[in-house]
């Protein structure tokens, strides 16, 4: 199996290579840094909605 790209690591070479987090797959998020011309920077990120969902699930686990 091909190695996946860890959280916050560069994924511009393969946008579908991000690893899985505890419950969700990270997404390759790209942006253009200010002052740079057409140099796209991509890294594996955890979407905010996933962070919130993980917090809710963790809380549910601790209250059970």
UniProtKB/Swiss-Prot annotation:
Residues 1-44 are annotated as: Knottin domain. Disulfide bonds join 4-19, 11-28, 18-44, 30-42. Signal peptide: none annotated. Keywords: Amidation, Calcium channel impairing toxin, Disulfide bond, Ion channel impairing toxin, Knottin, Neurotoxin, Secreted, Toxin. InterPro entries: Spider_toxin_CSTX_knottin, Spider_toxin_CSTX_Knottin_CS. The keyword Secreted applies. It is found in: Secreted. It comes from the Eukaryota. Belongs to the neurotoxin 19 (CSTX) family. 05 (U4-Lctx) subfamily. This is Purotoxin-2.
């Amino acid at each position: 199996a091909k190695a996946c790209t860890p959280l916050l690591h560069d994924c511009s070479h393969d946008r579908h290579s991000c690893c899985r987090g505890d419950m969700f797959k990270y997404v390759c998020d790209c942006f253009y840094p200010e002052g740079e011309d057409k140099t796209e920077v991509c890294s594996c990120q955890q979407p905010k909605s996933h962070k919130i969902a993980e917090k809710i699930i963790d809380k549910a686990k601790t209250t059970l």
